[in-house]
Amino acid sequence: MQQSHQAGYANAADRESGIPAAVLDGIKAVAKEKNATLMFRLVNPHSTSLIAEGVATKGLGVHAKSSDWGLQAGYIPVNPNLSKLFGRAPEVIARADNDVNSSLAHGHTAVDLTLSKERLDYLRQAGLVTGMADGVVASNHAGYEQFEFRVKETSDGRYAVQYRRKGGDDFEAVKVIGNAAGIPLTADIDMFAIMPHLSNFRDSARSSVTSGDSVTDYLARTRRAASEATGGLDRERIDLLWKIARAGARSAVGTEARRQFRYDGDMNIGVITDFELEVRNALNRRAHAVGAQDVVQHGTEQNNPFPEADEKIFVVSATGESQMLTRGQLKEYIGQQRGEGYVFYENRAYGVAGKSLFDDGLGAAPGVPSGRSKFSPDVLETVPASPGLRRPSLGAVERQDSGYDSLDGVGSRSFSLGEVSDMAAVEAAELEMTRQVLHAGARQDDAEPGVSGASAHWGQRALQGAQAVAAAQRLVHAIALMTQFGRAGSTNTPQEAASLSAAVFGLGEASSAVAETVSGFFRGSSRWAGGFGVAGGAMALGGGIAAAVGAGMSLTDDAPAGQKAAAGAEIALQLTGGTVELASSIALALAAARGVTSGLQVAGASAGAAAGALAAALSPMEIYGLVQQSHYADQLDKLAQESSAYGYEGDALLAQLYRDKTAAEGAVAGVSAVLSTVGAAVSIAAAASVVGAPVAVVTSLLTGALNGILRGVQQPIIEKLANDYARKIDELGGPQAYFEKNLQARHEQLANSDGLRKMLADLQAGWNASSVIGVQTTEISKSALELAAITGNADNLKSVDVFVDRFVQGERVAGQPVVLDVAAGGIDIASRKGERPALTFITPLAAPGEEQRRRTKTGKSEFTTFVEIVGKQDRWRIRDGAADTTIDLAKVVSQLVDANGVLKHSIKLDVIGGDGDDVVLANASRIHYDGGAGTNTVSYAALGRQDSITVSADGERFNVRKQLNNANVYREGVATQTTAYGKRTENVQYRHVELARVGQLVEVDTLEHVQHIIGGAGNDSITGNAHDNFLAGGSGDDRLDGGAGNDTLVGGEGQNTVIGGAGDDVFLQDLGVWSNQLDGGAGVDTVKYNVHQPSEERLERMGDTGIHADLQKGTVEKWPALNLFSVDHVKNIENLHGSRLNDRIAGDDQDNELWGHDGNDTIRGRGGDDILRGGLGLDTLYGEDGNDIFLQDDETVSDDIDGGAGLDTVDYSAMIHPGRIVAPHEYGFGIEADLSREWVRKASALGVDYYDNVRNVENVIGTSMKDVLIGDAQANTLMGQGGDDTVRGGDGDDLLFGGDGNDMLYGDAGNDTLYGGLGDDTLEGGAGNDWFGQTQAREHDVLRGGDGVDTVDYSQTGAHAGIAAGRIGLGILADLGAGRVDKLGEAGSSAYDTVSGIENVVGTELADRITGDAQANVLRGAGGADVLAGGEGDDVLLGGDGDDQLSGDAGRDRLYGEAGDDWFFQDAANAGNLLDGGDGRDTVDFSGPGRGLDAGAKGVFLSLGKGFASLMDEPETSNVLRNIENAVGSARDDVLIGDAGANVLNGLAGNDVLSGGAGDDVLLGDEGSDLLSGDAGNDDLFGGQGDDTYLFGVGYGHDTIYESGGGHDTIRINAGADQLWFARQGNDLEIRILGTDDALTVHDWYRDADHRVEIIHAANQAVDQAGIEKLVEAMAQYPDPGAAAAAPPAARVPDTLMQSLAVNWR
């Protein structure tokens, strides 16, 4: 069943119900079987799969709370902290713990929680588990911040759940509550109500009514009771008759049926009727059939002493159809079902929540006759008490003295009338059942033998009497309602107001019905006839009043003026005529009694008196109130002009409602005045008549009573008006949608305001954002709340809503910038990499969660709509995308308080960054921020001066303790708006955010992946971590500690202590009045006073003194303003930047960087290699000891520079660049520096030259323009940078750089190094051994070496894009003899250098070809496969990396192959050379032409083992060989001898002797008759053409001969013929020397004849090819004797083999 609980649902309602599909099928079957509608509360979705899995469900004996998070979701944890109560107050947890103990003490068990794999899958899909690694479970729930959970697989394939507190030692099992059998429990399926059909009780009603007697007996008792009742029409007898009539119905519907009680100690925990019990058992039997446990454990909410108020109810009809209904829909549905004969039994013991549900949804349901509603006195008198309480009387209720005041704060009257309402619906059904029973009884009377006609007559009379009583009750009810509504503080709902209106308009009809029915019932009783004549008149007057009231109501309609005037006339006529008619009836009756008759005469004077009475009846205060009400409507019209433009029409609707209310109340006031006047006139006329004073008295009493009734009807009239407007709202989409338009309109109004657009545009500029995402929380308007209250819709709206827009430059743009989930508290920013959005909250962001509203009667005529926020109220989660986002949290609500302002909880913020560089502007809330990738910043600048933060580093995390003292925080609470509507008062709660001041508040933020932290205005303490942090204290006396990493520290205003810690830190200071303590710690640290700080703006500066800083003393003296002085104490600071004023700065003995910035500064470097920069202004710079650098950037002043000791440099590279100059320089160059004359001339854009005095300076760096740099007799470094520079070194070993441009470089005397750089440069070395460094390939430079041994170096050229464009792998082509270097790897290219006087060349990293000249050259190949040729002279060739080719040519040369497989071309006749192969397998080659081997010359004699090579028999021609592996001979007769390594020896032409030596060698004889001896090792021998001889013997290893045909070839083996064993191995011939491991293979001997040798010699014998074949065939007949046998054993060899050996070896 586990696999199918989500499958098989018939519709969306089934799925939403949470009931497993298989169980639900059984429920529908039971509904059909029992002919009853079944209603259920929604099942927790986390319990759905558990029920389907067969988990047991809890009964009423379990009071503990289930869990809605983590692995235990749906179960009932023994530890309340693991339940849905997690995070609640300690006292709540303590009470929950008691509930758990109570459950365990009464038959329940604690069970170790285990889960199935399917359950784990569900938890993942539901988002309750977000990950699992090695059994450890992850989740987003806050509980996982306090607890760790893991699962372990058990032997039965389930997973045991364990937990421990974070940081705890051992895991323990999670225990949940189970039943007595040890099966875990989950929530059961709660039945809300059952509606059985009346047909279920027809038989039981009859037997119950008769109580064992016949129907005839029952009717006889009824007849006798009715006979007794005819003695009078007093209240007691009418009640008695009514009770008799309904006796059977009450029992029939089960309200008095046997109940089942279960007890737990003295507590009544459950009530269930017989029918409910029957249904429950049927449902559980169906559940068992599909593998579930009991799913329903108790009765319905109809018998629950503490019922719930649900927003939705799941309904299964008697036909098996299912649907999901809201409260309002349920009300209508129950009414429809009642009309079809189904009985709904309400709960009599509802508390506040339950009563509200039935007041709003069921109290005025269709099918409940108005006569059976709350205020019927007979109903009230017969209401039984709730359990344990006494029954109130009507009088007690009206006095509000019923003893109910202690119940949950509910007013006594409200609770009592609630019981009446509950009874009203039941008694309506009882009335219908009574009628059925009485009709059945009458028919039974007629059918039974022996029953007289009188019995049938009394049956009819009993029914008639019941109808009379019903009609009378309707009349009494209508009058009671009118009276009740006229009292101050009356309690009534909008539904009651509707009932009242119906009663008022039906008054005339009710009066006639009562008169007719009662007269018929008592027909024949003459003593009552006269009385009812008067009663008939009174009822006729009642009809007139009703008509008058109806006409008055028409005045409230939107009717033409003429129609309203007619209605007013109708009022006067009806009331006047009715009153006169009543008075006439009374007068005539009295006159008849006295036998006196007389006409009615009204004197003119009496009419005048009546007019006076009319004027007196109009109250000035009443008129004033109506006028004020009209003015308020005008104000609402003004509001409507703007709200209507944004789609909300409610203000206009409310204005019209008040105008209609004003008209209605004016009409009632006028009618009342007219009635008083008419009454007075009638009394006067009666007094003048014959009837005299009695008529006047009666008339006065009647008109006074009617006037009171009319005033009482005023409230129903305006209530009907409110109902009419409520219907209008329903017709316009319903209240929820209607009032949401108010929120939308208020949002649009603000979003389109000029002020907001400007503010957001400024924010975008200030934050350097690409757009601003504005989140606006909008509160409903006061006028909308007022309209909702009047129309009874205050519980059908939202008081706040959240809207999101994107703005660019203050204008709204399309797109969905965030995904907002208010219910779950989620904000996801939809941003992409490269964007720079900013998120801000335009209005304070309210708490997350959904709003639930409940309207409850709280006084006589008072209603209160309560609001409650449900869901995840304590946390917002904000998730960023990949952009660089600014998130402003300043206006996020930090606290949630209740209606009394008591703190419920703080609201936390989870902010999850993306890949960008994000900035979070924090507020007072508790924040957890994970910055993710990028460089992220959190700023607390919004905190006040009395607040402080303490930041500590915990590995990758920062913990930020915020101490808020008397701070302002945004707080959300509940406010109440009170609206008086006539006598009705509506108190409507709504969500409201305010800026509140708190005393002391401590919150702790956690920050992860954050690099930058900015403090607030208070005294903060901030400690960094191991990363490169940016820490700013803000205002206040702060303490900053950078920790490890290269940090930037900003103390800000106040007396700060700033510690750099490890790493190269930067301190940003201002010139404030505060003294600070600065400690750089380890690393190279810098203090900067040139950063503009806000505190400087508040100082009126008098003078231009900046700072006096002395790093050696550890002080920085500051003059922030006139007569103000402060000192910063510094230590472990290496670098310091001055202010924008005139500073004095001195370093210490460390390597300092000192920068004056603006102002006329004096800077001393002292010891160490310092960097000094004066900045703008007339500066004096002293380098003193050390190799110092002076950075010059101001060409408009003259500075004084003294380098002092050491090698010092003055650098002008930052002085002139396109961002500085505004016009071409007058002289067309940047600087002219002459160190020999100790000055530097600077050409300014103003055409004025300025000179810097430079002393003791060795080096100069020029500008980007045309410079002239001249050295002195010292070793100078002169760098021209850009422009066409002239650089002259002078004496000394100088380093000259031309930089960009066509430069002229002159080394002059000394061993100079010259770099031309970009451009066509001319470089002259002058005297000395100079070095020319060439770095570009696509230019034409002229290089003149001058005197000395000069070198041109192209090794850096390959690193530039100019080399080998389209010529991949080719370097330079240099020929010193021709004086040309082609730089693109081919001769004749356009990019070449002209060289002269150059002796040495260094090639590139590519393949170069470098040729020397007649001088002694040094040629270096560097990288690549180079070709180096020394030419004449004693040269040095170095191949470098790569497989190089080296040729020394003439002269005594030294050739070094270095790395790679190099090839040396050597002339054997050229003696005295050194050839060193270096790494790799290198080859010496004597084969080339011109190697001294002319005709008649001798061949080469070479020994790699001895390391020499010479002409044959001419040792004086010897050359030294080192690290050479291979050799190639000449065309003569050569002798090539290898060494112990693996050699390749190639004899080429001639009759060569090749000897491999030890190692696995390759010998190639090539042309000629060669002698090849592999010697030791496994060698490959290639004889080639000619008559070749191969030598082999003991100790030679395993050699292979590769013959290719031609010549007469021989193998000579140093062994006896009897030691050789011949065998065929594939196509090869193998010859083995027995007794050894040596073997000789002739490759492909059997493939064809070209691969064979002609003869083999062994000792003094030989064998030819034919003999070899015979030996192979003969030996193939015998097993190989192996290497151990020295010769074939003669004793075992047949004579045939011996004969073959003898015959073939000769």
Curated annotation (Swiss-Prot):
Start and end residues of each stretch annotated as C: 913-1656
Region (Required for interaction with CyaC): 500-698
One GO BP annotation of this record: symbiont-mediated cAMP intoxication of host cell
InterPro entries noted in UniProt: Anthrax_toxin_C-terminal, Anthrax_toxin_edema_cen, Anthrax_toxin_edema_cen_sf, Haemolys_ca-bd, Hemolysin-typ_Ca-bd_CS, Hemolysn_Ca-bd, RTX_pore_form, RTX_toxin/Mannuronan_C5-epim
Binding-site positions, ATP: A349, Y350, G351, V352, A353, G354, K355, S356
The species this protein was found in: Bordetella pertussis (strain Tohama I / ATCC BAA-589 / NCTC 13251)
UniProt keyword terms in alphabetical order: ATP-binding, Calcium, Calmodulin-binding, cAMP biosynthesis, Cytolysis, Hemolysis, Host cell membrane, Host membrane, Lipoprotein, Lyase, Membrane, Myristate, Nucleotide-binding, Palmitate, Repeat, Secreted, Toxin, Transmembrane, Virulence, Whooping cough
Location in or out of the cell: Secreted
Swiss-Prot/TrEMBL Hemolysin-type calcium-binding repeat ranges: 1014-1031, 1032-1049, 1050-1067, 1155-1172, 1173-1190, 1279-1296, 1297-1314, 1315-1332, 1335-1352, 1411-1428, 1429-1446, 1447-1464, 1468-1484, 1537-1554, 1555-1572, 1573-1590, 1603-1620
Region (B, Ala/Gly-rich): 400-912
Gene Ontology cellular component terms for the protein in this record: extracellular region; host cell plasma membrane; membrane
Lineage summary: Bacteria, Pseudomonadati, Pseudomonadota, Betaproteobacteria, Burkholderiales
Residue ranges, annotated region (A, catalytic): 1-399
Top-level taxon of origin: Bacteria
Top EC class of this enzyme: lyase
Residues lipid-modified (N6-palmitoyl lysine): K860, K983
Official protein name in the record: Bifunctional hemolysin/adenylate cyclase
Enzyme Commission number, as recorded: 4.6.1.1
Impact noted for substituting E301 to Q/K: Loss of adenylate cyclase activity
Effect of substituting K860R: Does not affect ability of Hemolysin chain to be activated by CyaC
